[in-house]
Amino acid sequence: MSGPRAGFYRQELNKTVWEVPQRLQGLRPVGSGAYGSVCSAYDARLRQKVAVKKLSRPFQSLIHARRTYRELRLLKHLKHENVIGLLDVFTPATSIEDFSEVYLVTTLMGADLNNIVKCQALSDEHVQFLVYQLLRGLKYIHSAGIIHRDLKPSNVAVNEDCELRILDFGLARQADEEMTGYVATRWYRAPEIMLNWMHYNQTVDIWSVGCIMAELLQGKALFPGSDYIDQLKRIMEVVGTPSPEVLAKISSEHARTYIQSLPPMPQKDLSSIFRGANPLAIDLLGRMLVLDSDQRVSAAEALAHAYFSQYHDPEDEPEAEPYDESVEAKERTLEEWKELTYQEVLSFKPPEPPKPPGSLEIEQ
């Protein structure tokens, strides 16, 4: 094995060799998942702490290669304060022939909403600020034509100033794509995805926001189902059984027959579940946790709800450029995905590092 690339160094962490630029110092493992492992580090160029994700076997198969390309392109496309941003992407390879590793550098966030809910009871002001930011990020993502599909507390990062960013777009898919059944952690999953009822739309993410908001308000999950059937039962105990109009929209005959076999349940008054909560919070929840996805509020509509009157500013809730999915919708070979990914790595322009304090702008 030859030595590290010029300007890079190697370090073994959790039985994995990392090869990173010398400006990334003090690598410390912070977690790992199916798609890669993450270290925190100090970036001497950006003068800030960052998260470095090493993708695991990015080109192991056609599916891996397409997912790698997609994740990189999505991260490059999305630039918003409430969405995790790409600070850098690199590979130790110096040619396409050696290209087998991809590292993504993003903002380091301290905690996720899971940690926050476990550690402290949140005030109504906290909940307002967190859910406002979540919806602000979601409005931006949705305006690009992207559905996240996997929103849950562990995918929502928060720093010590209560600033929030949405993470993990590995599973996000374009809005007009054929939809399949198995993606998010079940408790936060909209019923139409969970049971493969019908083609779904961006409001699946709004259902997830409703579940997250409910958890922030009461300190525990709203629908902690033990399996699909239990999950559906818990949902219907709160929102009631679907009306004939909603049933008619369910394309799965199996799901329709099953729901019709259940005893009818009335919709519960949410204020009886969230005792003492701000009535505006309860009103907003009631607009998000709606079985009929056509009747759920959009992210943009939710931002204008009176619950966020302290924060809502239509001039400061930006939208994204549309995301062009045609490139990744095509059938390609593994080598072609790899080549496209390599081009995306090479064409990335990192953000400008901060100017040292006291430095003067010099006119060229």
Curated annotation (Swiss-Prot):
Keyword Magnesium: no
Record Pfam families: Pkinase
Cofactor dependency: Mg(2+)
EC number: 2.7.11.24
Main subcellular localisation: cytoplasm
A biological process from GO: positive regulation of gene expression
Residue numbers binding ATP: V30, G31, S32, G33, A34, Y35, G36, S37, V38, K53
Post-translational modification Phosphothreonine, affected residues: T180
Protein name in the entry: Mitogen-activated protein kinase 11
Organism placement in taxonomy: Eukaryota, Metazoa, Chordata, Craniata, Vertebrata
